[in-house]
């Protein structure tokens, strides 16, 4: 990692599954307070904010999670529950509409959703790249498989210099071999497990 990022503090969390919380306000307050008490430079959320529907990310949850504070902000990627179909009435509540709702509400909270995108962070004259990989709904039925078919990583890493330190955020850890095989993911953050 470049010298300018020595001591750079990243707090990563994932798999909140809002629809499964028994006492959402208390649990989300505890999560937000814990994260903020660590004084992170950057917060990275690695997917599965909701369990079934985008509407689980309601005003109360948005207020609490929107209170996360870090100088470099909060970035996120989507997970299989954010992008998947886990209910019988998926015709009435299409997965794509729910995913769009989750992404829109995260942006409304001030989170930067990285959808197969790379951004650059600068500190002390040094730079690193931060790539976020969206959950591919085509992998929905393979989400727990140990090996995945080749993923198209080109768009996410397009133009990223090989020599630049790269942090990759991805929901499913099974993509690590492919990411590393492309020469990226010096640090890979994932959830799902």
Q: Which residues make up each language-model segment?
A:
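Soluble catalytic domains of enzymes that build or remodel membrane lipids, polysaccharides, and related
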Residues: 4-193
